[in-house]
Amino acid sequence: MRREISFLLQPRCLLLLVALTIFLVFALFNTGKDEEKQVIEDHEITNRVFLDVDIDGQRLGRIVIGLYGTVVPKTVENFRALCTGEKGKTSSGKPLHYKGTPFHRIISGFVIQGGDIIHGDGKSSDSIYGGTFPDENFKIQHSHAGMVAMANTGPDSNGSQFFITTVKASWLEGEHVVLGKVIQGMDNVFAIEGGAGTYSGKPRKKVVIADSGEIPKDKWDEER
């Protein structure tokens, strides 16, 4: 009579199976981490801008943002120019500048949002192109805290409003154009969230961009 040997009953085979399982789990885990790292790091930073922030009239500190100008050049140019104020005024006479504007929406565990250069309450927006402009692309993901993206009222309605994530926000993919990431001052972003954030989004304190501008490349340090 032919004797059959079950694979699962052999000690050596059991050890082999366990080792193979551990190897596959480890490989899949590392692949996921590598892909996440690639999403975060593969985009070239073409410009650096800063936001100096006050809370209730007291200086909090600086947030430095690296911009992805090779991926979303039109969106980046709008944001960069609004940081410097170099484009003058809107058709209604308001400065095309983030300086002096508030973070009007601060949601605990989600985002800090600002950039309403018209009324400062989140109900209006404008751009250096005159009015709103289309979504450029959605190639960059909201992959971790510190991603900077355009706020909008629906498809192709980008203006001056933007937000900075305080968590990974993958549910926003395909709806908001990511244009950069915080490279210095993330502690200040969390301080804004913790000090003024609410679950409704209405700030508990007055948070204002006291100054903003661009950092020349010859002033960049080695940190990305």
From Swiss-Prot:
Protein name in the entry: Peptidyl-prolyl cis-trans isomerase CYP21-1
Enzymatic reactions: [protein]-peptidylproline (omega=180) = [protein]-peptidylproline (omega=0)
One of the record's GO cellular component terms: Golgi medial cisterna
PROSITE patterns in the cross-refs: CSA_PPIASE_1 (PS00170), CSA_PPIASE_2 (PS50072)
Keyword Chaperone (UniProt): yes
Keyword Chloroplast: no
PANTHER family in UniProt: PEPTIDYL-PROLYL CIS-TRANS ISOMERASE, PEPTIDYL-PROLYL CIS-TRANS ISOMERASE CYP21-1
